[in-house]
Amino acid sequence: MLAVHFDKPGGPENLYVKEVAKPSPGEGEVLLKVAASALNRADLMQRQGQYDPPPGASNILGLEASGHVAELGPGCQGHWKIGDTAMALLPGGGQAQYVTVPEGLLMPIPEGLTLTQAAAIPEAWLTAFQLLHLVGNVQAGDYVLIHAGLSGVGTAAIQLTRMAGAIPLVTAGSQKKLQMAEKLGAAAGFNYKKEDFSEATLKFTKGAGVNLILDCIGGSYWEKNVNCLALDGRWVLYGLMGGGDINGPLFSKLLFKRGSLITSLLRSRDNKYKQMLVNAFTEQILPHFSTEGPQRLLPVLDRIYPVTEIQEAHKYMEANKNIGKIVLELPQ
């Protein structure tokens, strides 16, 4: 089968597509013939040598994919049959023509969505769902500040925040992105390149601050985050795009806010946790991708590349130009 590969860590120029052995499904696993796989920041970090796959995971890039069930391993429980369409949450391996998946990490394709659209859901939407509900304990009426609000996770988080009855606020780096955030349901957006998002957030909330922050930036934002955090607020850190170093009195500022700093990753969670998350998402959220009206959810796709243009896809994401997801299509 064909798969994305790199021989040494470095820039996008190291990526290429090569022939590798097709995997075989193990106990309780399904072999998925991949139609499409979306790009995530973790793919860029792994390519750079900064994010190793979890033990036992494929070293091929790709944390989410959609396609057709091609083979069932021993011990499968009969939830899937050969030929079914499905989308999958993966610890790696999605950017290849075939990938093995524990059957509990597969989800049905929502009615009305293409396989390419569906590939943009698993990692991004399950991450946003986990951050808001399982980690951040979002409540109706909460102000939620979403950094990188027009990323894949960000576009999902805006919509899920609205669904929870909370109020999404976003940061982004262009007017175009902020306009899209408003269309998705953001109550306000702040251009971090042109204004102090912390002061703008406090002004919008009439000095109260935000109850929940979803932060994939990290170090460079710490002081502004604490400044606009409400009393007893929750700050959920799930990425370090702005670095991991802190200089200054973070703990004292956080303490006087009675604030909570919580860290979270999804990729390294065990399969039992991921299956619980997939089940909850499938039951509570997935139907809303197919309903009509204001509660309908929408995976936001920016660009679609053939997998042979993997270098261009990485360059585009690294330039922070994307609004929503970048999806790779695999040859069928």
Swiss-Prot record:
The residues listed in the UniProt record as binding NADP(+), with positions renumbered to this chain, are 41, 148-154, 173-177, 192, 264-266, 322
Family, according to the entry, reads as follows: Belongs to the zinc-containing alcohol dehydrogenase family. Quinone oxidoreductase subfamily.
Q: Which domain of life is it from?
A: Eukaryota
- One Gene Ontology biological process: NADP metabolic process
Consequence of substituting S151V: Loss of enzyme activity
Q: What is this protein called?
A: Quinone oxidoreductase PIG3
Q: Which InterPro entries match?
A: ADH-like_C, ADH-like_N, GroES-like_sf, NAD(P)-bd_dom_sf, PKS_ER, Quinone_OxRdtase_PIG3
Q: Which residues carry this modification: N-acetylmethionine?
A: M1
- Say which enzyme class the record assigns: oxidoreductase
Source organism of this protein record: Homo sapiens (Human)
- Quote the CDD domains the UniProt record gives: p53_inducible_oxidoreductase
Please give the subunit comment from the record: Homodimer.
Q: Name one GO cellular component term.
A: cytosol
What are its E.C. numbers?
1.6.5.5
